[in-house]
Structure formats: structure tokens, C-alpha cells
């Protein structure tokens, strides 16, 4: 049933669900190739001299008379150490046609690793990297004295169980290519009950322990290797642990781009300095945002007279929908300007929903989430008084002719949305109606945004199954359309769609009507339009590909999003990224179509009311 604000309630949810047969786990790195040949035991009966003979010892000779004093070759550990591929490797850029799963449209590869909370196992291209890291024959390496000092240092790291140092950013989980173009429907994901993994994946909590103090920190991308680099890395790591607050404290530990433990540690440590970056929106703003109009407060619904405390301005409407209308108001005692959400009490369930919304908002003390000021109940309605946000909708702001939208602007907006979502999920709250209309700018000049409208939000317990059948079709996830169990990853799908629209100005699943839109969501067939995404970075495409994934277990959590390379090092990116995105022009067309649809619904409702009143039906009812 469609409503004025675009949200619909799915009256007859589809009972069809997508099942995925279990895929075989990826094979480990291949064994090392044999050396050119052992020395002749007749010519060289004694043990090989490492200074004179670079060839390997005779295996038969060692089996007959093993030397108890002989120490294991430290280079032999290379056979099992396979560093994860870096971004830009040829293997990662061209995945095989059979490496994609039907549940993962973003290029998910392989079966989820055991105990990795739904994260995919080591990527197939790691095999190629492993072959390159296999120990060379000693004849090729030369004598120990002739070995390069840098090579010896790397081999020592490997022997101690540490990952060799590498330059560049961590490898991406998915290919940044178009999911439709890389045959994402060919290889299925492993079938695993969702309720077995919810407790692990919720809030982006990693299954494996975080990096220890003995693990080496990875140099951030673009940083030069100075002589005192190791000391600098240790200082940055300590500052990262001390500076992160309660909300973003898990950011450096939550992301798992690879299934290799050493790589996960390096990723977390490389991103921890930028994960604690303060006020990302101030990178683009010349002045700080206005302070919060009032501190966070715990609100209780109480009866009272609205007109004695507030002056409602019904002519200055801010929005409306199924649950009521929103207008501006002023508190008479303080002169504080607020937004008033008026909800009609038609059934007992209406009051129950309002009480749930109040309970949810009392938990959300975050600068990127709208704050509740008061709640008053009258005999016929309930009014929620909230923080007034004057900047308007985010999409309305960025289509302004005087505004130049760049990819860095999009990063700043998306990072703040992720911050708000992460806090909600830590408070066990799911928004379930994330869409452009519910992202507002604090003012008309800055880049600070807030998430609003918790009328459809739900408290969430990972140990309990939760299903919903409402939302806005364009931004609904497949599990909502199918009336399947939902989780915190349901909000992440909506974030992926919003990010896609910010980058391109196109809605990936929008059809001619709601039915076609819902069918598009269920099929999850989408792609990166070549023309509109021409100027968009591969990191941005990879970010979206990790969110718009049909299987919710394969989507990134909010913590993993905040640790993704695309949302980090924003200050450096802002210095070199000033190209205007084409999405501004296309977003104007999208907003015009949306306004036309809203006006059409309003006019249709007025015409229906006019026909009913002219037929005398209302008079017969005594109205």
C-alpha cells in the first residue's frame, strides 16, 4: 500500500527464497617445486657445505643419518606463507567467470571462512601470489653471504611468523568491476543458517582477535619508508588505540578484507590513524557547524496542552506521510525553534508505535542522528518535538546550481551516515527506512548531515528472528521483500543504494511502478553505468559492490565501511580530487520525477475525495 512519503507495506510478501548450494572451499597455496636436482651421493658423501655448495641436501642421505644438531632452514617457512595480493594485482582485476555467487552481486568469491562471521575466505588470486612466494632453489639464491640484506630481512620476518612488509593499500574484497559484467550469478555461496551467524556479524564484531602488540604495523598508503619508520608506526598505533572513542573503537578491528590473519592485522593497523579522523566534514567546510540546539535528553510521553507550551506553524510544513505531518514550532518559554511531528491516534497500535519511536530515540545520542526534545499526548493525537534541521534534504542540497559535487563530497556524506548507522547498531537499533529523504543537512552551507525518521525503527536482538514487510521499494533489501529474517546488514543494503545514487544520480532498481521495482530488487541485477561512473574511482565502486550484495551475510558492516580505504585519507584526497560528478544533473531529473509522483498522488487523493463528497456518500455517513 503506497503512502505519500513513498513507503509501502508489502501486503502479500513473496514466500520464495533463494537457496544457495554449498561451494567448495578454495585450495591452499601449491607446494613448492622441486629443486633442479640433489647432489650425487657418490661424489659428495658428506653433508653439504652451505658455504661451498648452494644446492639442497640429499633427502635420502638425511633419512639415513639425520643430523640432530642441524637447525631447520628458516627459508622453509616461505612454503606456507602466502601474503595476500595487493590492490591492482592482475589476478584480482579479472576474476574467473565461476568465482561469483548468486547471492553476492558485488563479486563475492569463495566460501565464508569458518569462524569469520560470514566474511569470504581467502581470494582465489592468493594462489598465484603464493606461487611467487615459494622458496627458490638454493642454487639460484646463491650463498648466504651474497644474499641481499633487504631480502634477508624479509625472510627473517617470514621465519618469525610475520607478514612481509608491502606498500600500497590493502587488497579489496570484491572486484570493482560491474557485477553484471563479471557473471556474478554463476558460483553460489555456501548455504549457512542465518541465525547461526547473526551474533557474530552484528555490529561488525570480528571473530578473530585483533592485532597484537607484536604484529607489525603496515605503512599507510603514500607514506615513505623512513629510517625510523618502525618507531613512527608504533607511535601511530598507540595514538590510534588511545584516541578512538566508544563508537569508533572497533573500527580498526572490525574489517576483514582477507581471510589471512596477518593481512587482517595489517589492514586494521594501516587504517587506524585515519579511522579516528575528527570531523571529516570540516575538510570541506570553512567554518565549524552550529552547536547542538540542546543536549541529549531522556523523553517520556506525558499528557498536556500543546498550545500552552508551543506555537505550531502548520503553514510551514516540513514533510508528512502515513503516520502524520511535520511542521515547525517554537517553544514559548525559550523561543527555541523545533520540528513538530503530529501523529493521529486512530488505533491503540498508533500509540504503541510512538512509544517505540520514543524509546529508540532516547538511546541515540549521536551528532549524526536527530535528537528528541519532548513528547506530549492529547486526546486525539501525539506530538513529538524534535531538533529542527534547516538545511533540508541532502539530495535537494547537492542539486543546487551553486553547489559542485565531487567524489570527496560523497565520501564525507557517506562517512557520516556510516557513523550514525554504527552507533544505531551498537545500540541494537535498526532504522529500516534509510533513503535520501531521511538524510538532512544541518545547514545550507556546511557538510554536516543527520539521519531522521525513526518511525519504522526496531529494537534488534541477534538471538531472535525479526521480519518486517514495510519500507520504500527502491531501498528495500531482498530479505525484506521476501519477508525473510533481517539483521543489521539490512540497513547496509540501503546505504549501498544511497551511495550508488550519490555517485551516479541513478537509482539501481527503480522501475516504472512498485511491482517492477520490487522484482528488480529480488533479482538483484544491477551494474555500473559506463558513462556515469567514468569519473568514479575503483575504491568507490568496490565500496558499493560490498554493500549491494543479495546475501546479507556477505555485506560489509558499518564498522567495516568506516575502515574501507574509500572513506579514509579524505584530507589527502580532497587536495587532488576536484572533478565534478555527473550525478548532479541526473539527480535533478530524479528529484523532479519524485516530486511529480508525490503531486500526482496528492491530486488523485483530492479527486477521489471530491467524487465521494459529490455523490452524497459522506452525507449518508453523517459527515
From Swiss-Prot:
Superkingdom, taxonomy of origin: Eukaryota
Cellular localisation: Cytoplasm
InterPro entries to which the protein is assigned, alphabetical: Kinase-like_dom_sf (IPR011009), MLCK2_STKc (IPR042717), Prot_kinase_dom (IPR000719), Protein_kinase_ATP_BS (IPR017441), Ser/Thr_kinase_AS (IPR008271)
Major location (coarse): cytoplasm
Sites bearing Phosphoserine, chain numbering: 169, 175, 177
Entry keyword set: Acetylation, ATP-binding, Calmodulin-binding, Cytoplasm, Kinase, Nucleotide-binding, Phosphoprotein, Serine/threonine-protein kinase, Transferase
Biased amino acid composition, Low complexity: 20-31, 90-102, 204-214
Phosphothreonine PTM sites in chain numbering: 472
GO biological process, one term: cardiac muscle tissue morphogenesis
Alphabetized Gene3D superfamilies for the sequence: Phosphorylase Kinase, domain 1 (3.30.200.20), Transferase(Phosphotransferase) domain 1 (1.10.510.10)
GO molecular function terms listed in the Swiss-Prot or TrEMBL record: ATP binding; calmodulin binding; myosin light chain binding; myosin light chain kinase activity
Pfam entry (one): Pkinase
EC number in record: 2.7.11.18
Reaction(s) catalysed (UniProt annotation): L-seryl-[myosin light chain] + ATP = O-phospho-L-seryl-[myosin light chain] + ADP + H(+); L-threonyl-[myosin light chain] + ATP = O-phospho-L-threonyl-[myosin light chain] + ADP + H(+)
Binding site for ATP: 318-326, 341
Region described as Disordered: spans on this chain: 1-179, 204-251
Record field: compositional bias (Basic and acidic residues): 32-43, 49-89, 150-159, 215-224
Region of interest (Calmodulin-binding), residue spans: 601-613
GO cellular component, one term: cytoplasm
Regions crossing the membrane: none
Function as written in the Swiss-Prot or TrEMBL entry: Implicated in the level of global muscle contraction and cardiac function. Phosphorylates a specific serine in the N-terminus of a myosin light chain.
Record-stated family: Belongs to the protein kinase superfamily. CAMK Ser/Thr protein kinase family.
Subunit: May interact with centrin.
Name of the protein in question: Myosin light chain kinase 2, skeletal/cardiac muscle
Protein species of origin: Bos taurus
Amino acid at each position: 500500500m503506497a503512502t505519500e512519503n513513498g513507503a509501502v507495506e508489502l501486503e502479500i510478501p513473496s514466500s520464495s527464497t533463494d537457496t544457495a548450494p554449498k561451494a567448495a572451499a578454495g585450495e591452499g597455496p601449491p607446494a613448492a617445486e622441486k629443486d633442479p636436482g640433489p647432489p650425487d651421493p657418490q661424489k659428495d658423501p658428506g653433508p653439504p657445505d652451505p658455504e661451498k655448495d648452494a644446492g639442497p641436501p640429499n633427502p635420502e642421505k638425511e633419512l639415513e643419518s639425520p643430523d640432530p644438531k642441524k637447525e631447520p632452514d628458516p627459508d622453509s617457512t616461505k612454503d606456507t606463507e602466502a601474503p595476500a595480493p595487493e590492490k591492482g594485482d592482475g589476478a584480482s582485476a579479472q576474476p574467473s567467470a565461476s568465482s561469483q555467487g548468486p547471492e553476492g552481486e558485488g563479486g563475492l568469491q569463495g566460501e565464508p571462512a569458518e569462524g569469520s562471521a560470514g566474511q569470504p575466505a581467502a581470494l582465489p588470486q592468493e594462489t598465484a601470489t603464493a606461487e611467487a612466494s615459494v622458496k627458490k632453489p638454493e642454487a639460484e639464491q646463491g650463498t648466504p653471504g651474497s644474499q641481499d640484506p633487504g631480502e634477508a630481512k624479509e625472510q627473517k620476518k617470514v621465519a618469525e611468523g610475520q607478514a612481509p612488509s608491502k606498500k600500497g593499500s590493502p587488497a579489496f574484497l570484491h572486484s570493482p568491476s560491474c557485477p553484471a559484467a563479471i557473471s556474478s550469478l554463476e558460483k553460489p555461496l555456501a548455504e549457512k543458517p542465518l541465525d547461526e551467524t547473526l551474533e557474530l556479524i552484528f555490529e561488525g564484531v570480528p571473530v578473530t582477535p585483533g592485532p597484537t602488540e607484536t604484529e607489525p604495523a603496515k605503512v599507510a598508503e603514500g607514506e615513505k619508508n623512513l629510517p625510523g619508520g618502525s618507531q613512527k608506526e608504533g607511535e601511530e598505533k598507540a595514538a590510534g588505540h588511545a584516541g578512538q572513542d566508544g563508537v569508533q573503537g572497533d573500527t580498526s578491528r572490525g574489517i576483514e578484507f582477507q581471510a589471512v590473519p596477518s593481512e587482517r592485522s595489517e589492514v586494521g593497523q594501516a587504517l587506524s590513524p585515519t579511522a579516528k579522523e575528527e570531523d571529516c566534514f570540516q575538510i570541506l567546510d570553512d567554518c565549524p557547524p552550529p552547536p547542538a540546539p540542546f543536549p541529549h535528553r531522556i523523553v517520556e510521553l506525558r499528557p498536556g496542552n500543546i498550545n500552552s507550551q508551543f506555537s505550531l506553524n502548520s503553514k510551514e510544513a516540513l514533510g508528512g506521510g502515513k503516520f502524520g505531518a511535520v511542521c515547525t514550532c517554537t517553544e514559548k518559554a525559550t523561543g527555541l525553534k523545533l520540528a513538530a511531528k503530529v501523529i493521529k491516534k486512530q488505533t491503540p497500535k498508533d500509540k504503541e508505535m510512538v512509544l517505540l519511536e520514543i524509546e529508540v530515540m532516547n538511546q541515540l545520542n549521536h551528532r549524526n542522528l536527530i535528537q528528541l526534545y519532548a513528547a506530549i499526548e492529547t486526546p486525539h493525537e501525539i506530538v513529538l518535538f524534535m531538533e529542527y534541521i534547516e538545511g533540508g534534504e541532502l539530495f535537494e542540497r547537492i542539486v543546487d546550481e551553486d553547489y559542485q559535487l565531487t567524489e570527496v563530497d560523497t565520501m564525507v556524506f557517506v562517512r557520516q551516515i556510516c557513523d550514525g548507522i554504527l552507533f544505531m547498531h551498537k545500540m541494537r537499533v535498526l532504522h529500516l527506512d534509510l533513503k535520501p529523504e531521511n538524510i538532512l543537512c544541518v545547514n545550507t552551507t556546511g557538510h554536516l548531515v543527520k539521519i531522521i525518521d525513526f518511525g519504522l525503527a526496531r529494537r534488534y536482538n541477534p538471538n531472535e528472528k525479526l521480519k518486517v514487510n514495510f519500507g520504500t521499494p527502491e531501498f528495500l533489501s531482498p530479505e525484506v521483500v521476501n519477508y525473510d529474517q533481517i539483521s543489521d546488514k539490512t540497513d547496509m543494503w540501503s546505504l549501498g543504494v544511497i551511495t550508488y545514487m550519490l555517485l551516479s544520480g541513478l537509482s539501481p532498481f527503480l522501475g516504472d511502478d512498485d511491482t517492477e521495482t520490487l522484482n528488480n530488487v529480488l533479482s538483484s541485477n544491477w551494474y555500473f553505468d559506463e558513462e556515469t561512473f567514468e569519473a568514479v574511482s575503483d575504491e568507490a565502486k568496490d565500496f558499493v559492490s560490498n554493500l549491494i550484495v543479495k546475501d546479507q551475510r556477505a555485506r560489509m558492516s558499518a564498522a567495516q565501511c568506516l575502515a574501507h580505504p574509500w572513506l579514509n585519507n579524505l584530507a589527502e584526497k580532497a587536495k587532488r580530487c576536484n572533478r565534478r560528478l555527473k550525478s548532479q544533473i541526473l539527480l535533478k531529473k530524479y528529484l523532479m520525477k519524485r516530486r511529480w509522483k508525490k503531486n500526482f498522488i496528492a491530486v488523485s487523493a483530492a479527486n477521489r475525495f471530491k467524487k465521494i463528497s459529490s455523490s452524497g456518500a459522506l452525507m449518508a455517513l453523517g459527515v
